Design a protein with these regions (language model features):
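Intrinsically disordered, low-complexity segments enriched in Ser/Pro/Gly/Ala and basic residues
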Residues: 1-2, 268
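Core alpha/beta nucleotide-donor-binding catalytic domains of modification enzymes
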Residues: 2-212
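ATP/NTP-dependent adenylation/nucleotidyl-transfer catalytic domains that generate, transfer
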Residues: 201-271
Length: 271
């Protein structure tokens, strides 16, 4: 599913998004925008609001207050006003995102957020998040530095099964600069999370220090990294198919046959 066509930066318009939702993604019982109030989710929400009469399912938004920033209550109110102006139902949630020992604040917030949202989405609902191509490049680099294989280097898929339905990222083929330009051209307002500027988090360090230096030397690097992630996703799909076939070949009566398994080349056994 990660190799589905992506909405391209040159096609950041409602019609292109509608085609992706209608023809390339599963048909859900409802579309739910994960709306933080930030730039990316604001653009996604407005794009979908323009499409609402033509969507195959009802459109709603969900905002999660992690209670990690002093302005979080104001951000929730901002999201309420935006959704009210667009006449989009908004579900506001508040979670305890305090990290456990050894857990990063970002990981704790992400886990709490998805757990809370999962509680209110029904079967076959689709959660839409606003990650874009620059986020994909950051994810690829983070996985590379962790020594990931092709599964991890696939980075983020356009759509995957999640919580009795799906999680989709319809802007994954769009550059951050295109999203900002679209928002500014339409006079949209959004909130700025100061934690996104802090250099302590690994992703922020990549975003503000590493990737700009890479792009200064190789201007097409972000697009190239996205292509590499797509190649890895294809390779991961093939390896999963191979592993399924190998498992059948080395199994007898639903049990692994050790002799057959050991006869395989090491790389195929590890797979």
């Amino acid at each position: 599913m990660s190799s589905l066509p992506e909405l391209q930066a040159s096609a950041l318009d409602p019609q292109a998004l509608l085609e992706q939702l209608d023809r390339q993604l599963p048909r859900p019982t409802g579309y739910w925008v994960a709306f933080s109030g930030g730039l990316d989710s604001t653009v996604l929400l407005h794009l979908l609001a323009m499409l609402r009469p033509r969507l195959a399912a009802p459109l709603s938004a969900v905002h999660v207050d992690h209670a990690l920033q002093t302005d979080s209550v104001a951000w929730a109110e901002h999201c309420r006003r935006v959704c009210a102006a667009l006449d989009i139902p908004l579900h506001s949630l508040r979670v305890d995102a305090m990290p456990r020992q050894g857990e990063s604040p970002e990981a704790a917030a992400r886990q709490a957020r998805y757990a809370a949202v999962a509680q209110i989405l029904g079967p076959r609902a689709m959660l839409l998040t606003a990650q874009h191509r620059d986020d994909q490049a950051e994810t690829l680099l983070l996985q590379m530095f962790r020594g990931a294989g092709v599964e991890g280097l696939s980075a983020m898929p356009v759509v995957r099964s999640w919580n009795r339905g799906w999680l989709a990222r319809p802007l994954l083929g769009v550059r951050r600069a295109s999203i900002r330009a679209w928002a500014e051209a339409r006079g949209l307002n959004w909130v700025e999370d100061p934690s996104n500027m802090a250099g302590v988090a690994d992703r922020n360090y990549l975003r503000h220090q590493v990737i700009p230096a890479i792009v200064a030397r190789w201007p097409g690097a972000v697009d190239s990294m996205a292509r590499s992630a797509a190649h890895c996703a294809d390779a991961a799909d093939m390896l999963r198919s191979l592993a399924d076939r190998e498992l059948r070949d080395v199994s007898v009566a639903d049990r692994l046959e050790q002799a057959r398994l050991k006869s395989r080349p090491p790389a195929r056994s590890r797979n």
